[in-house]
């Protein structure tokens, strides 16, 4: 539901700025791809099923042939981009919740499921956003990328990173992998910020 809702919002945003992705077909393809990846993460599908993802994406190209459009290449690009940008990342999230290798090593009796990693990632992202907003509002002076996002500042970026790392250290107390959580926090800070800038650029 979240995946399809996010994909729908992405396509609506693209339509507002003048593009025409094949919304209905792309959402149908996106739901199938999401299902395949999720079932693979559960161990219900083997790797061979993942090979169906490519022809499903190619089907969007074929369907565009039956629609009269002034810019079919751009429409195809944004139809596929929505799936790559929204559906696949959200489907991969399931691997963090169902990771028997990790949880067995941590001696956590979860029946192959635990919310530790998943909750940790989201809380770190929230800490990064909150820290960026707080430090940016109070101390913000130097713009991070004014042309794309006028409100983002370097002070906010570093403040968000600090709070994210502290949050990562806290989660590291649960499994003893403090260094790993710090690395995860830094990755979230960098790519979370890049994601925000990319979204701001699309909106503009």
Give the ranges of each region predicted by the language model:
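Membrane-embedded alpha-helical bundles of polytopic integral membrane proteins
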Residues: 1-153, 157-186
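Transmembrane alpha-helical segments of integral membrane proteins
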Residues: 58-62, 194-204
């Amino acid at each position: 539901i979240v995946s399809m809702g996010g994909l729908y919002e992405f396509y609506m945003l693209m339509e507002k700025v003048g593009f025409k992705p094949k919304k209905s077909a792309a959402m149908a393809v996106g739901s199938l791809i999401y299902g395949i990846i999720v079932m693979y993460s559960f161990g219900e599908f083997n790797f061979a099923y993942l090979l169906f993802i490519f022809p499903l994406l190619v089907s969007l190209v074929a369907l565009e042939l039956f629609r009269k459009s002034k810019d079919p290449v751009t429409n195809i690009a944004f139809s596929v981009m929505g799936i790559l940008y929204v559906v696949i990342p959200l489907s991969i999230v399931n691997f963090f919740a169902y990771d028997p290798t990790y949880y067995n090593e941590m001696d956590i009796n979860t029946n192959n499921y635990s919310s530790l990693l998943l909750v940790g990632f989201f809380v770190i992202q929230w800490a990064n956003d909150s820290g960026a907003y707080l430090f940016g509002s109070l101390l913000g002076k130097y713009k991070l990328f004014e042309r794309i996002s006028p409100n983002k500042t370097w002070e906010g970026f570093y403040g968000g990173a600090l709070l994210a790392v502290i949050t990562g250290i806290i989660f590291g107390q649960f499994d003893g992998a403090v260094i790993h959580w710090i690395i995860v926090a830094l990755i979230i800070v960098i790519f979370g910020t890049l994601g925000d800038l990319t979204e701001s650029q699309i909106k503009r």
